[in-house]
Amino acid sequence: NLMEAKVAVVGDLELFAEVNAAKEQCPKLEAIVLIDGYEDNKELDYVHSYHELVEKGKELNKEDSTKLDSAIATVTPDSLACLIFTSGTTGKPKGVMISHKNVLWTIESLFGQMIPANKFPRIVSYLPMAHIAARAGDHYQAIYRVGQIFPVPVLEDMRDALPTIKPSVFLAVPRVWERFKGGLQA
């Protein structure tokens, strides 16, 4: 529990089972928000429905939008945008704090010359969201450049997906380029 998170948001029952089993080792964890599968676990007082929380947030914002506006006003370029954990290949995994300024600098320095600001990139996304390359090169890039993201979660499906998607941006780690090369040479 390196993050000491108070809330965990999980997408499905499989991941929920893992997080719920680890809850004892996470003393600061107060709530688990389930995107899918809430009905099966609503008897647990620390489990909440993502969809119900979104609706409650909308209602609260209608009642008093100044709270949200005030919270937004506190965000600065140095504010935390996200935490990304390293893989731990050179030791214990570490949580890396990424600021909004870090995100913008990365997008501009890596892609500023390749993708003009007025272009709307079509981006293939296949890396896990926990991977910094996926966050910066796919998701943040698409948000910043008003682009489109096309997820291809199974790498083996890439060959069939590329002609359909016709990406204008394709970010790849060396292992992926090696697999492409091997496929072309076969």
Where do the language-model regions lie?
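Conserved S/T- and glycine-rich ATP-binding loop of Class I adenylate-forming
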Residues: 8, 80, 86-89, 123, ...
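Structural core segment of the AMP-binding/adenylate-forming
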Residues: 1-55
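Short hydrophobic/charged patches on amphipathic alpha-helices used for structural packing
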Residues: 1, 69-72, 159
